[in-house]
Amino acid sequence: MEILILGHTGLLGNMVKSYFEYCNIQVNTIPNNIRWNSLEFKKFIIDNNFDFIINCIGAIPQRTKDFSINYELPIWLDENSNSKIIHPGTDCEMDNDEYGISKKIARDYIVNESKNTKIIKTSIIGTELNSNYSLMSWFLSNKDGDEVKGFTKQMWNGNTTLTWANFCLDLINNWNKYNNETILYSDCVSKYEILKNINTIFNRNIKILPYDSISINKCLVGDIKTNNIEIQIKDLKKFIEK
């Protein structure tokens, strides 16, 4: 079985690669100098004819204002490759900003028109390799004694990148069992509670100040219930320390 991971150095891709290799599953990656939408990229995908492609490439608001790759790439993969493709969905698909719209375009295409792509939809937290844009990596980049705000009214029920990778492997092994979109969800918690868990589990002493901002509920109604986020963060820490 030939598996390609796109975006293997990003937040999600680096965990999927690490987890699959930990499970003794050989994975392939695309050379960093071959960029999306180039002839070399398209030739690489088509010529290699992978059994599965896990698409972890995506543009996020912290890094760019051009989000076209979020829908152009997954649609192109579905229309032009014979591989089975796994695509990450997000709770931001409900947002009406350019990022949310770009994710929704991809989601609507896959759910309604896709021939060989399936979505694992959830919001994710995890550790990055080379940057600190995501919630967990940003938080852990602070020094002990630093003060940060913890939003008490911003609710979330996502999962760690490790949980995503674990389910991704199950999806590969049981492809026909799942619909075009599977939503993973955990217990709904506040961003403040998430930071408190990270602080404790990673043995940090960052001061988290409760902050009552406007209420935002990003909790998804899902298909598969996962462990609560405290357990997931503990499992993530154990895994990255192996």
PLM regions: where:
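Short-chain dehydrogenase/reductase
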Residues: L6, F67-Y71, D95-R107, Y133, ...
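Conserved catalytic-site region of short-chain dehydrogenase/reductase
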Residues: H87-I101, I125-N130
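Amphipathic terminal alpha-helices
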Residues: N227-K242
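N-terminal Rossmann NAD(P)H-binding glycine-rich loop of SDR-like oxidoreductase domains
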Residues: M1-C23
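NAD(P)H-binding glycine-rich loop region in Rossmannoid oxidoreductase-like domains
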Residues: S38-N80, C92
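NAD(P)-dependent short-chain dehydrogenase/reductase
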Residues: K104, D108-T163, L169-D170
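Mid/C-terminal beta-alpha module of Rossmann-like enzyme folds, strongest
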Residues: A165-N217, I240
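SDR active-site strand-loop-helix element
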Residues: L6, I53-I57, I85-D91, I120-T122
